Design a protein with these regions (language model features):
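Membrane helical hairpin/interfacial module
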Residues: 1-62
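Long, contiguous internal "core" modules enriched in hydrophobic/ aromatic residues
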Residues: 6-15, 63-64, 69-241, 247-248
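Juxtamembrane boundary at the C-terminal end of a transmembrane helix
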Residues: 251-267
Length: 267
């Protein structure tokens, strides 16, 4: 959507498709959050008893505002009022960033969870969200490539160039994600107490090397190879496979960080 409003009109159809996907997926996100909390029927307390000093309260506010801004953006976008859509898109951009970063921000305040208490945690969740989101955009573009554009070789040729640009964004974000994972591994090696706890989890069978290396190899390194290899860099099928693997990797890597931290003893 950002490219679509930087005078790159070739991205506009993809921006419309992506914006619709955001709203549909966002409709399911609050339900998953409610299922995860211990007392879902009391979620309204976050609104009725709003505490400005609480990160959770601000996160709830952001999650509520974001779909509203997205709906207004979509309204102007599909009406062809691009300038108004651009304004609402720019207003919604920091809200979108906050909606993904606040999860890690809240976790970083959990001082009893040694794996989460770092300033890198919000950045990790933000980068992972950007990576999986861009991967979803590539999947949507692949669907468009093989459906609405299949009868137009010229349009498909132009779309392959878009695939290439999206792929460049993907592997930049993959490198960023790998760097943050490396930080977590360095923290593990440089914190004797944390290392001992993780080693105990592995010896008890609650955690294994495969839990880390499967999402790391299949979800990040394999897609990176597909995105940088000359033969596959502009191939829509390769991009589709890489994007599906990225979403798999981001999900399981995030789940690993959450579950591993909860399995460790409180400090």
């Amino acid at each position: 959507m950002v490219f679509a409003h930087l005078d790159k009109k070739e991205y506009l159809p993809l921006a419309k498709l992506s914006a619709l996907a955001v709203i549909l997926l966002w409709a399911a996100a609050p339900l998953l959050l409610l299922l995860d909390i211990g007392q879902p029927l009391l979620f309204w307390h976050l609104f009725a008893y709003f505490q400005p000093e609480s990160p959770m309260a601000w996160g709830t506010l952001i999650l509520t505002i974001y779909p509203f801004l997205g709906s207004v953006y979509i309204w102007y976008l599909f009406r062809g009022e691009i300038q108004k859509a651009k304004v609402w898109g720019l207003i919604g951009l920091p809200i979108a960033l906050g909606s993904h970063g606040f999860v890690g921000f809240v976790l970083s305040f959990s001082t009893a969870r040694i794996l989460w208490t770092t300033s890198v945690t919000p950045i990790f969740f933000l980068v992972s969200a950007a990576l999986s989101g861009l991967a979803l955009v590539v999947i949507l573009d692949a669907v468009r490539y093989y459906s609405t554009l299949r009868h137009s070789p010229e349009a498909q040729a132009r779309e392959r160039l878009i695939f290439h640009h999206l792929g460049e964004g993907l592997y930049i974000l993959i490198f960023a994600d790998l760097s943050l994972i490396l930080f977590y591994l360095m923290k593990l090696g440089l914190t004797p107490e944390l290392f001992d706890h993780v080693l105990k989890l592995m010896t008890e069978g609650k955690l294994s090397i495969a839990d880390l290396f499967i999402p790391l190899v299949l979800g990040l390194m394999a897609p990176l190879a597909l995105l940088v290899a000359p033969r596959t860099a502009r191939n829509p099928v390769s991009q589709l496979i890489a994007s599906a693997l990225i979403i798999f990797g981001v999900f399981f890597m995030g789940n690993l960080i959450l579950s591993a931290a909860q399995a460790l003893p409180l400090v």
